[in-house]
Design a protein with these regions (language model features):
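Active-site microenvironment for binding and transforming phosphate-containing groups
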Residues: 1-221
């Protein structure tokens, strides 16, 4: 499995004319922790499964020899690019990360480290589970209702049945990023649901314990 994953990364990097050994991936743990990457830890292989990136769900860099990677199987992945300061970020935002506003944490980190202006930052939302399939019970619904009182709750939380709710975590991220200063037109959502398209994209909800992982990768030329 590890060999296949490494080959998949290598094939992807070759396809986009980037160097596989430049890849860095955090050990995602549904946190709001975002780390800056200035240099590689390994010399001749990617920086995967390193203690330096434990409990980390977002990475930022302004180095052209570093590729930032994240993986998902329903969770939201967001890629950020500041064309003015030449800085990028790659973020894993599952429902727990969304509750902790890791996307906003990332913007603030780019502002602090690189002097980014939020109005310049472009964000791409990758394929992920959508409201049509993100079904939760009362305990999780309450967490979202309490955290996002500043948003229009009727647009992001929909009651499906007596004990089930549908939550639009993509819209939540779009809204909180706009509140953080990103322009609406700079938030680009692919509009693809991983559950609806599980024949093309890995989905934990569909594949269960045999689930695979999709990846998002971004680098500066």
């Amino acid at each position: 499995e590890v060999k296949k994953a490494n080959k998949d990364y290598s094939d992807l990097c070759n396809a986009i004319e980037m160097n596989y050994i430049d890849a860095v991936k955090p050990n995602q743990a549904h946190t709001k922790n975002v780390k800056k990457v200035d240099e590689h830890v390994n010399i001749n292989k990617p920086d995967f499964n390193l203690k330096e990136y434990d409990f980390t769900d977002g990475l930022i860099t302004n180095k052209s020899n570093i590729l930032l990677a994240t993986t998902n199987a329903d969770c939201i992945l967001l890629m950020f690019f500041d064309p003015i300061k030449k800085a990028i970020a790659n973020v894993h935002s599952g429902w727990k990360g969304t509750l902790q506003r890791i996307s906003v944490e990332t913007v603030e980190k780019m502002q602090k480290e690189y002097g980014s202006n939020s109005k310049d930052i472009i964000c791409c939302i990758c394929p992920s589970i959508r409201k049509c399939h993100f079904e939760v019970e009362k305990d999780v619904q309450t967490l979202f209702e309490n955290e996002f009182k500043d948003l229009k709750l009727d647009e992001i939380i929909e009651r499906k049945s007596e004990n089930k709710w549908l939550i639009d975590t993509v819209k939540i991220n779009e809204e909180i990023l706009q509140k953080a200063g990103l322009r609406k037109e700079n938030i680009i959502d692919c509009g693809i649901c991983s559950v609806c398209n599980s024949d093309l994209i890995h989905s934990y909800r569909v594949e269960k314990e045999k689930y695979g992982l999709s990846t998002a990768i971004i680098g500066l030329k």
